[in-house]
Amino acid sequence: MEEHYSRRDFITKAGVFVAGTALHVDRFSEITRRKEEPIIDIHQHIYYNARNDEEMIAHQKAMGIKTTILLPAGRPVNLVSTHLGVSDGFVSKYGRVGGNAETYLFAKEHRKSFRFGANAVPDMPDAIPEIEKYLKLGAVVIGELKFSVDCDSDGMQKIYQSAEAYDVPVLMHWQHGMYNYGFDRFYKMLEKYPRVKFIGHAQTWWVNIDKHHEDQSVLYPRGPVTPGGITDRYLSDYPNMYGDLSAGSGLNALTRDEAHAKQFLEKHQDKLIYGSDCDDKSGLVSSGVCSGALDIAEIRKLVPDVKIQRKLFYENAKRVFRI
């Protein structure tokens, strides 16, 4: 029977499970182990759920992150693409995550450990100038694109064209009924823009590892996975398609069927990239709420091969983001 959890509920349940297995470690040993290998985190935000700068820096340090890529929000505008201002890219009940300017200034001040992305509401008239302003300043990615638009709309395609011109990847949040519509026809964009590196993220991206996932409204399914879903095919068939392992959705994909997850990570070891996208202040597995830390632990458990781990945690990000 398929179950449907919210992101917060899932992470809490997964945290309890992981903390109760061999992955459970104390604070000292956890941090010590993570210092042994470099990790690039391709998915974080400033001001995420009211977490301040010092707390975010401490969180990344606790996870053992060498380099963090910060993804900005779009502007708070009252358009259909932002659900009339409710979701301009990243709004929660605690407020809005940092936009382009704030994210750029933070990364500039902490350039040793942080990089930044560029973002804009795609149907705003100045979307491309806004994005290109920050690409010229050194943004390494466009995204996270998290808007109520068709994936093949004119505005989105202009963004893909900018990504091609500046040779940066595009990171997209796929969520049925909310963000980036048309997942099943996205292959047309992959074919139209073969030089653009697209990175899939979030619930709809990860539920579709399963060939038999039919109810797209179920965002955190449990139980066995049948290989050959749309996501699996996109990664297999298109050299320019990559996957972001972050958040509760990525963690769910790894824990719901560990036998499948092991094979999936090995099969797509050159296409999957670690990200955290967690809003907690801990950064530790033992907290039970940090999806980023739980992701790291689960990946290490599933693929003990250090060469594959290095690809997932470091080399793929370094290559795709050119950092």
Residue ranges and their predicted role:
Residues 2-42, 51-74, 132, 269-273, ...:
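Mid-to-C-terminal alpha-helical segments outside catalytic/metal-binding sites
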Residues 41, 56-86, 114-119, 139-144:
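Divalent metal-dependent hydrolysis catalytic cores, especially in the metallo-beta-lactamase
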Residues 47-49, 75-78, 122-126, 149-152, ...:
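Active-site environment of divalent metal-dependent phosphoester hydrolases
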Residues 140-141, 153-274:
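Catalytic pocket-lining loop regions of alpha/beta-barrel enzymes
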